Amino acid sequence: IKIRGTSTFSAEGVTPLYIVDGVPLESIDGINTNDITSMEILKDAASAAIYGSRSANGVIIITTKSGQEGKARIDIKYNHSWGTLSHKVPQANRKERLLYDQYRKEYFETYGGGNPDESSDILNDPLNSFFNVDNDYLDMITSTAQKDQVDISVGGGTKKLKYFINTGYYNEKGIISNTGFQRLNTRINSDYSPTDWMNMGSRISLTYSKKKGLNEGTLLSAVLTRRPYFNTYYPDGSLVGVFNGQKNPIAQVNYTTDFTDSYKANFFQFFEIKFNKYLKFRANINANFYLDKRKKLEPSLITDEWQKQNKGYSYNYLNWNWMNEDILTYARKIKDHNFTAMVGVSAQQWRYENETFVGINSSTDFIYTMNAFAANLDLSSTGSTLSNHSMASIFARVTYDYKGRYLLNAIMRRDGSSRFAKENKWGNFPSVSVGWRFSDEKFMKFSKKFLEDGKIRASFGITGNEAIGNYDYIYSYSPNSIYDGVGGVIPTRIGKDNLKWEETKQFNLGLDLNFWNSRLTITADYYDKYTDGLLANYQLPKESGFAYMKTNVGEMSNRGFEIAVTGDIIRTKDWKWNASFNISRNVNRIEKLSEGKAYMEGDIWWMQEGGRVGDFYGFKSAGVFAYDESNAFTDKWEQLTPVFENGVFQYKYLLDGKEYAGNIRQKTLPNGKPFRGGDYNWEEPEGTRDGVIDDNDRMVIGNAMPDVTGGLNTTVTWKNLSLYLGFYYSLGGQIYNAAEHNRNMFKYTGTTPSPEVIHNMWLHPGDQAIYPRPYNDDYNNA
């Protein structure tokens, strides 16, 4: 979930802050949707700033159900749903794979370079039943997902005591065979008012879930690349594991053991005391516990074709935290003036524990607990970590309005985080907003027949982000290093004690219109966000011995608009038809980087001044050379057209249809080897055009962020029966498909390309192909 673009480079800090019943949570995965009564999204800094440092990417406020005064009400709900693949990845069938094998064989026989597969004749033998099948692996490992959910709730109460209890069970059978998810959760909400001046309440949530999964990346790779004519079973009926270097997806699905048991518990208690009709005090206390226990076993059948050693994993992750928040509120109304002042303090602490055990080659494939691997632990991968993180805050808010017509809201929050050194531990996050309900002005009386409410809003605020490692500001060392069988301590991270808060300044201008007794409502917003002190990994020279260090690397902006329209098309006693539409656009720009230096984030993301977050970085093709002679360019790198007659090159070139007599240049690899027919014609960016294709010729080839997003929803209601339809759209934005890239790069003989590539690849001189020759050769066609 992203709100108003991306305001940080940090992967941990891109998500919004979740507030559930007043409690900030890192995740809402364990919440039963049937427990939710309302959800509110805070987008602008003025409304989000009260939540401080973690609200730079917006705040989602969730309120769960509470009991109502009256007799106990019991509700039972059951829901069953189905799920299918929304898009099936095209896979080559047996005929297409044999065609590809033939193409490669003919290519090597014609151009040399080695045998593509010395056993190709055996593998393609139509009389050998083991290789005479036509598998659609995706169909073989997938089916219709089945989802069941049951909820039983009871709620009610008296004037003093109200309660709500819900127990839910969710069971999902995954689309991929032998995968699934189960969840059992209970929520107990209660509110108690023993006197007129005291209120208290509790929110208790308990969740247990069990996930049965697989290594989706490895499985997808096997599905897309394994030859379709390889049988999945041997003639004796036993299951094939790894054959010809390729894993059998059926064996992976049926023999891999991967269970994750998750335990979550959240306990929230509040106390509220009213000193008089103006002044009240509230204390919030929360404790949260989260435990993950994962057991995984890769049997010897699918781990290695020759050594056949199984591999076991055990992961234990514990996260618990507590929070205390104390708030004093004063509210007063004097004639037409409404005034509220609030001041509070907050403290929160987290503790993280992680244990990892990896074992190799146990005596059985049926015991996945680590005692089976006790004699063969992989010490380089086995270990444990312990870390802590704490925050302290003080905050205040003042609100004022005159007749509800002129509105003012001011907030100041000061947060301290243990993730920064003493000098930069504290961050200040102020905000202010004003509003004008112009529909209440005398000069707007003429609009009362159609305009019920009209308001203009403006706000400015600063929010922060501290989503980095718990100890990134200090040097770290590891005692787990082993070299030549001898243990030792090595430095693992360079500290930076001048790390500071990432700050996002946001200006927002909004308009709210309500027509004909809420028959039509329109909300429009324009925002401008500017982030300073971006926290990211800064690449270091190799001579330092470290890959990177955490630092404040630059600045970034996000600008855009949001429009939402909701209307009741039909509103009668029995019939109601409501429709809503929203659209938003965000423009992101990296304004500044340290020393103006661009750098790679991961394998594909390119960060540069003037660029955008989500830019893909790679080589861009201008097509495929039809002939060896097509690799011909002018001194200005304009491509020339070779002249052929009856298939024979005439040693002539054309430029814009006219014979060219100037100097001829070629594109080459760094070693001087020229590109040939069937190779990609790689483009070169302005300023690097020298004809030598190397890493300097990579450029931005796309972006993952959409240009426009939005939704369309409609609900038709007749008495107590309703029909809801919802649509979400995203325009622009691209996806980097690593699996598609890997299977279509021709690097490995056994890899099966997509059908589109097989039917549109270059095979003979003169082919006007989309894809290159069926042989990988460095930059030529990778």
Pin down the residues of each PLM region.
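Outer-membrane beta-barrel transmembrane strand signature
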Residues: 122-155, 160-166, 237-274, 376-397, ...
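Conserved small-residue
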Residues: 75-77, 81-128, 356-358, 551, ...
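Membrane-proximal, glycine/serine-rich, low-complexity loop/turn segments characteristic
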Residues: 1-17, 25-28, 46-272, 338-339, ...
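Phosphoinositide-dependent membrane-docking surfaces
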Residues: 33-42
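Extracellular/periplasmic, surface-exposed regions of secreted and cell-surface proteins
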Residues: 15-17, 148, 183, 189-208, ...
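Non-catalytic regulatory/gating segments with a bias toward low-complexity or hydrophobic composition
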Residues: 22, 39-40, 60-62, 563
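Conserved active-site-proximal loop/helix segments of enzymes involved in bacterial cell-wall
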Residues: 536-539, 691, 741
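C-terminal beta-signal and adjacent terminal beta-strands/loops
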Residues: 84, 140-141, 449, 589, ...
